[in-house]
A protein has these predicted regions:
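NAD(P)+-binding Rossmann beta1-loop-alpha1 motif at the extreme N-terminus of oxidoreductases
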Residues: 1-62, 86, 123-126, 327
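General beta-strand structural signal in soluble alpha/beta enzymes
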Residues: 47-48, 91, 109, 113-117, ...
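Beta-loop-alpha module in the N-terminal Rossmann-like domain of NAD(P)-dependent dehydrogenases
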Residues: 63-78, 96-99
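Short glycine-/small-residue-rich Rossmann-like dinucleotide-binding loops
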Residues: 67-69, 94, 119, 152
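Rossmann-fold NAD(P)-binding glycine/threonine-rich loop
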Residues: 85-88, 92-142
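Helical "substrate-binding/catalytic lid" subdomain
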Residues: 133, 143, 155-332
Length: 345
């Protein structure tokens, strides 16, 4: 099948490579000509403009957008006038499902089809395959199945689920038509909210292990410091790289995320290349908005989202307010920041 790909960033380019390896034909475009040229040197058909890309595609066309959510509308403003009835636009980025519904209605008025695809797999997807969560019209999604099946990991990516009827759904292949327009990005939104929680649990657990030698370090004994009452219980120097490694092997908390952090800790036990400012790209906020609208409790997901805000310094003023109040009502002096802990073991 032929596909136009707009956006050749860290995922888009590798998706094209996986599609090409799987015998699908791609025509590619990016606002950065160098990104197009790199794939052209690998034998992929490059386009010099959106007009050129559309002209090179057979009708009815299928065009996949792999661009940041913030630029989807701007890209569509330029792309849609070039398309014809029956053409398909696929948004494979992390758009808000509300926007999918709006955009789909706008395109339907022009007799164009819109499909939303939540794409998970990151930079490893080229080899591992991509988990695809899809929303849109059934017949349109079925038309695109050669693309989805090529991008997806396939049934061999995970053991068969006990009690499940084999072949009952494309979910076993790593792609799923989740429902009508917006459903794909809704499922991906919640997926990313869960991802936030998993990442935070690993981070907090490893941090507790890192500070398990607290009993070896003297603390000031005054009214401003909560004493460590039994320092003899905190005398451990843990090798976090080794702990992450042993957890990978047969542990109930084993996962790809753990594989990644184990590899990082093996090369940089102190994680010195990271400042600890954790971004959030929108999906966590949208997940919480959905939970509030649905009246569904999600305390873990809300806590980890707020923790990301705090990591970027957004809590600094609030903390200064707290410190000022303690000083004003009780004369409590503010303690200087503790030096960063060094690596263990």
């Amino acid at each position: 099948m032929q596909l136009g790909m707009i956006g050749l960033g860290r995922m888009g380019a590798d998706m094209v490579r996986r599609l090409t390896k799987g015998a699908q034909q791609c025509v590619v475009y990016d606002v950065q000509p160098a990104a197009v040229e790199r794939l052209a040197q690998e034998g992929v058909t490059g386009a010099s403009s959106l007009e050129d890309l559309v002209a090179r595609l057979d009708k009815p066309r299928a065009v996949w957008l792999m661009v940041p959510a913030a630029v989807v509308d701007g890209t569509l403003e330029k792309l849609v006038p070039l398309l014809e009835p029956g053409d398909i636009v696929i948004d494979g980025g992390n758009s808000y499902y509300h926007d999918d519904i709006r955009r789909g209605a706008d395109l339907a008025a022009r007799k164009l089809h819109y499909v939303d695809v939540g794409t998970s797999g990151g930079v490893a997807g080229r080899e591992r395959g991509y988990c695809l969560m899809i929303g849109g019209e059934t017949q349109v999604v079925e038309r695109l199945e050669p693309i989805f099946s090529t991008l997806a990991p396939g049934a061999a990516a995970a053991p068969a689920t006990s009690g499940r009827n084999p072949g009952s759904s494309t979910a076993e292949q790593g792609f799923l038509h989740c429902g009508p327009l917006g459903a794909g990005h809704f499922v991906k939104m919640v997926h990313n909210g869960i991802e936030y929680g998993l990442m935070a649990a690993y981070a907090e657990g490893l941090n507790i292990l890192r500070h398990a030698d607290a009993g070896k370090h003297a603390r000031e004994a005054d009214a401003e410091t909560s004493p460590l009452r039994r320092p003899q219980l905190y005398q451990y120097d843990f090798n976090l790289a080794d702990i992450a490694e042993v957890w990978r092997r047969g542990s109930v908390i084993g996962s790809w995320l753990l594989d990644l952090i184990a590899g990082t800790l093996a090369g940089d036990a102190d994680l010195q290349q990271y400042a600890g400012r954790v971004s959030d790209s929108g999906e966590g906020r949208w997940t919480m908005s959905a939970a509030i609208d649905e009246g569904v409790p999600a305390p873990v997901l809300s806590a980890v989202l707020f923790a990301r805000f705090s990591s970027r310094g957004e809590a600094d003023f609030a903390n200064r307010v707290l410190s000022a109040m303690r000083h004003d009502f009780g004369g409590h002096a503010e303690k200087p920041a503790a030096p960063p802990a060094s690596s263990q073991g």
